[in-house]
């Protein structure tokens, strides 16, 4: 019972004819308006070797043309994209997905058994509603903490870039900027990611991308509860402008009674306070590194008490107001403190008590008739003249705002009556 394209054509009823491919968002591209060509029975499926309908399109500007690689039956068996063979729900390789849900692949590998298995699966798909996977995947657990942590929630369009130009690597490319291929240095041939096989990706064996993700999952950080049992608040970051308080409440209410939810739009974060510590620990355990709301992955951490924040400020040196720093060179020295006289506590301009205008103790130039000393002689040997006692200010002036003559403030004349 041969069903391949190069064999006899008597069994064409098992060839696949489809109207639209099964693709992920990354392979479709970011442009919602694409032109897609359809070729009926264009190629053999790279897994089951049956002819199927091939779709070809360009996912965007400066991207390479892509086409479907496996038939829709194989795609539905593994719930993967027909082009990249990554899981449609999590965006992960099949080996990572099967490890997360504890699924063991039991698909046959020989030609006859593979054809028989494919026909039985097609019959099962036809009898189902098409919304759930069939076979062993349909019986596996629906979710896994590891898969939620590793899941790719946003498309990665760099995967659609053109291949590297082999002529440019050899220094022989004459197209320049018009070359449709990338002019970049190729990856190291010894890199495990440089050798990938589509059959290994489908069967979930020897997949270097999956091995890299599984190693990352084994070293992922954990969220330990704080020692202070009075902390029942969780910090949720990365909200963006679309996530509201009601959406956070709809997710976190399942873990226990919520006391308050405070959303800080400016910082794009929220603080969720639970009524009990047990509810907060359950919410932190179930939501750390796997909380996705409206397609956004949110960051969940434990809130900190005021005492812990004060200790952190002391440790960093930012919260100690009495801490002394080294003086900055080149700056003038500090001004002397103002006089501490009890009677002039409210006298901001250092005015005398009788209200007469006070003259400031400002050094004046010498009188016109008195010239400077001749060369070779010292200054005049007489003490400087002091102002009369009734014109002497009670204190020194340290700031321009203390000078009444510069501020335009004059003391009022005493009334004659």
Curated annotation (Swiss-Prot):
Zinc finger map (C3H1-type): 159-186
Basic and acidic residues bias spans: 309-318
Amino acid composition bias (Pro residues), ranges on this chain: 369-391
Protein location: Nucleus; Cytoplasm
Domain of life: Eukaryota
Coiled coil location: none
Task performed by this protein: Required for pre-mRNA splicing as component of the activated spliceosome. Involved in the first step of pre-mRNA splicing. Binds directly to the internal stem-loop (ISL) domain of the U6 snRNA and to the pre-mRNA intron near the 5' splice site during the activation and catalytic phases of the spliceosome cycle.
Family in the record: Belongs to the SLT11 family.
Protein's name in the database: Pre-mRNA-splicing factor RBM22
Organism: Xenopus laevis (African clawed frog)
């Amino acid at each position: 019972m041969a069903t391949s394209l190069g064999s006899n054509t008597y069994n064409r009823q098992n060839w696949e004819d489809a109207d639209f491919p099964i693709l992920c968002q990354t392979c479709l591209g970011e442009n919602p308006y694409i032109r897609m060509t359809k070729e009926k029975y264009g190629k053999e499926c790279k897994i089951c070797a049956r002819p199927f309908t091939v779709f070809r399109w360009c996912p965007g500007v400066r991207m390479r043309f892509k086409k479907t690689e496996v038939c829709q039956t194989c795609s539905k068996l593994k719930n993967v994209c027909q082009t990249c063979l990554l899981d449609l729900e999590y965006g992960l390789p099949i080996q990572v997905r099967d490890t997360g849900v504890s699924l063991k692949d039991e698909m046959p590998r020989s030609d006859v058994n593979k054809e028989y298995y494919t026909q039985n699966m097609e019959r099962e798909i036809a009898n189902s509603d098409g919304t759930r996977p069939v076979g062993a995947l349909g019986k596996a657990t629906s979710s896994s903490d590891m898969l939620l942590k590793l899941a790719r929630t946003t498309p990665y369009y760099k995967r659609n870039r053109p291949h590297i130009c082999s002529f440019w690597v050899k220094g022989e490319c004459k197209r320049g900027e018009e070359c449709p291929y990338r002019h970049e240095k190729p990856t190291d041939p010894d890199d495990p990611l440089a050798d990938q096989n589509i059959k290994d990706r489908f069967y979930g064996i020897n997949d270097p991308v999956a091995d890299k993700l599984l190693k990352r999952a084994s070293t992922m950080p954990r969220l330990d509860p704080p020692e202070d049992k009075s902390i029942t608040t969780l910090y949720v970051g990365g909200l963006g402008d679309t996530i509201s308080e009601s959406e956070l409440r709809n997710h976190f209410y399942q873990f226990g009674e919520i006391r308050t939810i405070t959303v800080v739009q400016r910082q794009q974060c929220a603080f969720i306070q639970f009524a009990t510590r047990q509810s907060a620990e359950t919410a932190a355990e179930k939501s750390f590194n796997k909380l996705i709301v409206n397609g956004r992955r949110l960051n969940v951490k434990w809130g900190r008490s005021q005492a812990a924040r004060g200790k952190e400020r002391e440790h960093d040196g930012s919260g100690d107001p009495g801490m002394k720093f080294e003086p900055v060179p080149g700056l003038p020295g500090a001004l002397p403190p103002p006089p501490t006289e009890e009677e002039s506590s409210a006298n901001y301009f250092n005015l005398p008590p009788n209200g007469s205008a006070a003259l400031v103790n400002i050094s004046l130039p010498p009188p016109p008739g008195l010239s400077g000393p001749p060369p070779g002689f010292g200054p005049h040997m007489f003490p400087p003249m002091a102002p009369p006692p009734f014109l002497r200010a009670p204190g020194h002036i340290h700031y321009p705002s203390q000078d009444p003559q510069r501020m335009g403030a004059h003391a009022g004349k005493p009334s004659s009556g």
